Amino acid sequence: MNNSEQLIALKESETAFLKYFNKADYELVDFSVVEKLDWKQLNHEDLQQMGERNFWQHEHQIYALRNDFTDQLLRYYSMYPTAATKVAYTGLIIRNNEAAVQVGLENYAPSLANVQQSLKLFIQFIQQQLRDNVHFVVLGHYQLLDALLDKSLQTPDILSMIEERNLSGLVTYLSTEHPIVQILKENTQQQLNVLEHYIPNDHPALVELKIWERWLHKQGYKDIHLDITAQPPRSYYTGLFIQCHFAENESRVLTGGYYKGSIEGFGLGLTL
């Protein structure tokens, strides 16, 4: 496919996405790639993100190029509440001076059934329009770390070693028998079963992970991995997250996660 054909295919995929989810009764939203920001309203995490954002000042006003749709929509709907419970979007995101096209969905005040239906529809779009399918799925939950590791041990060094899966370092700091070390020693496909030995069966994170595992099995996805190493990109990500890796285009990953800040939601996004 030459450059012109790739450009046409990309634009067609964007349009097809909007048509598909408009037909499924999602509200279509279109926000400017340029965000107008108020320094007084930016929190510590917002300021930390500025390192990857392109921003400038004009007449005492700060402007920045969009780097995250979920964050932009959450910020906007916190100021201007919407009655919509499910929205669909397409557009550019710019991170570290690199631009990409993203398509995605947001479910507000989400129920499990609505989120799973959104994921099901998203995968159907991938199959029909992108001619691809999900090869394997990664599940995780941002409450797992607190369930497995005492707060006093959640130091930057230890968190970094968990993220890097540095077993030798973790053994030194935590011990060989520590639950995190024992879980990470297992194949990621087995870790969800191993997890049951280290946290109560009625722990909300484990219950939710098991519900999703059963649902994914019913959809025909058997290759499911657990990730206990991921740490939330923003503090409002407090629940389950999912990554659906593609069979044909291995660079593409459909990602999603639950968040609760000024608004509660579950977002799903794919970079084309």
From Swiss-Prot:
GO terms for biological process: L-histidine biosynthetic process. The keyword Cytoplasm applies. Pathway: Amino-acid biosynthesis; L-histidine biosynthesis; L-histidine from 5-phospho-alpha-D-ribose 1-diphosphate: step 1/9. InterPro entries: aa-tRNA-synth_II/BPL/LPL, HisRS-like_core, HisZ. GO terms for cellular component: cytoplasm. One of its GO terms (molecular function) is transferase activity. It is found in: Cytoplasm. Keywords: Amino-acid biosynthesis, Cytoplasm, Histidine biosynthesis. NCBIfam families: PRK12294.1 (NF008947). Belongs to the class-II aminoacyl-tRNA synthetase family. HisZ subfamily. HAMAP family: HisZ. Heteromultimer composed of HisG and HisZ subunits. This function is generally fulfilled by the C-terminal part of HisG, which is missing in some bacteria such as this one. Required for the first step of histidine biosynthesis. May allow the feedback regulation of ATP phosphoribosyltransferase activity by histidine. This is ATP phosphoribosyltransferase regulatory subunit.
